[in-house]
Amino acid sequence: MDKIQTFFENHHCTKPVCDDQCIDNFGEMLKYNMNDISSIECGTRGKHENENWHRARKGLLTASRFKEVLHSRDQDVMAQRLLTPSTLDEDKLPAAIQFGRNYENKARLMFIKSHRYHHRKCSYFVPGLMVSKSNVFLGASPDGVVKCSICGEFLVEIKCFFSQKNFHPKNALIVSKVCEKVDDNTLHMIPSHKYFYQIQGQLAVSGLEKCILVAYTQKGIYTVDMTFDKDFWDESERRLSNFYRKYMYSALKNIEETKINTDL
């Protein structure tokens, strides 16, 4: 966010609406090299418990909001909403969020134990914020990165189902309409679900090809494999970039210029 503030402090466009050149300059300013991207990821580990993570996400479109952005009816309002600081009271979190906070690590440990039983040579770490190498407006914070001697490198995304906490996790995925059964009785994620958008975004940002969704309830865990869908992502990325250029940039510009004028 510091780069964004600096850009607008030195940006003296007199046009009511900035043209493509202004926005291109903004994008060039935001670009990170590989060392920057690695430093951001390392420096934001701990996610919501790390203030650096909150700061680094400001001004980005992050994977958990991709479906919301792509299907918003009023995109000006959507841009404002994305830039509005969270009003969540950490001492009075909604029950579903608190359930996720309470059990995410348990689900992670259950998955690691299960995976290592079959694939002993593997490592797991929880990344911070990943920034896209190819599109500086996009970021993601997956729940894990696994490096396995058999499976290669892949992401993990953990979902703890509060409303279905007493269901078997496979049934929780079906009842919540995250997944559907296919002919061989396995589950596939439904492409219209927000988790599908989120995971495809995480894969695109990370550059990896596979993610394992880990569903947790108090009956255990169930996993669903997902692979990168290039056609889906190419269209989504095009629309996300258009949203950023048309709506997010203007909203950022208004916020930063208001701050500058207030400080004068």
Predicted regions and their residues:
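Charged, glycine-rich intrinsically disordered N-terminal tails and low-complexity linkers that flank
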Residues: 1-110, 114, 167-189, 254-264
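Nucleic-acid nuclease catalytic cores
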Residues: 115-140, 148-250, 256
